[in-house]
Amino acid sequence: MNLYYYFELIADERRIRGLFLAKSASASEWKAVSAAIKTLVEEATFDATNEGLTFRAMDPSHVALVDLLWPSVAFESYQCEKPFKFSVRVEDFIKLVGRSDAKDSVEISSTEEDAISVKFTNGYKREFVIHLIETSAGSAPLPKLEFDTKAILTKTIFERVLNDISAVSDQVTLAAQNGTLAFSGKSDMGKAAVALDKTGAELLDLEVKAESKATYNVDYLTSIVRAAGQAADTLTCEFSSKKPVKLEFRLNKQGCRLGFFLAPRVSSE
């Protein structure tokens, strides 16, 4: 038996014994996902099946929810012959993912129940092992909602609008009617208002089934847009009057999707 054949047998044996393996061409999706999760929770439990990777959790105050769907076909390489859950401290996971360079491929795998391996490769190969944690947190149910308004806009303009509104208020009111998507905020200091329509380059599409108006916390929205926006240039915003808002980010062209739900603020008017 030559050495090459021997090493191939070892590699095949490891692949067979492996509980889970997911390889992506870059770390941008992992950075966006982990940063988005960090805005809501300190611990995260990922569910891996042969269909892909999912994560869903609600913040402690139960006003916001993040929902990740990362199908197996969206990875460069993916293996999961039986369901596998792994729980990590989000801050620790971010530290490791943050060690990657822009052109690194990322491989996350596990051959044992209590740890995962994180590998970065781009000529310079690095491997980190992070021990898994035990957590009692379960997966949050996904809200079943139908929305009256759906807008597709650039991440840049949405973040800019939120920053403008936050200059005078910690709440932003979204209103849609007659082909216009409006944002406003007010406080004892004063008022701020921004209006977008499809004549501009920033609002890519707007569908309004019925006039919609609802108010949300600016900080929650800003945090998730900054986090997920690391890997997404555009976002979909859906809402209805006095109902939660849903933001959806497509993190790659193969179907990796990050959703975010935020409950409305109760108006004092």
Residues covered by each model-derived region:
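DNA polymerase sliding clamps and clamp-related checkpoint/processivity subunits
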Residues: N2-K38, E43-A167, A175-E269
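Polyanion-binding surfaces on beta-sheet-dominated domains and ring/shell assemblies
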Residues: V172
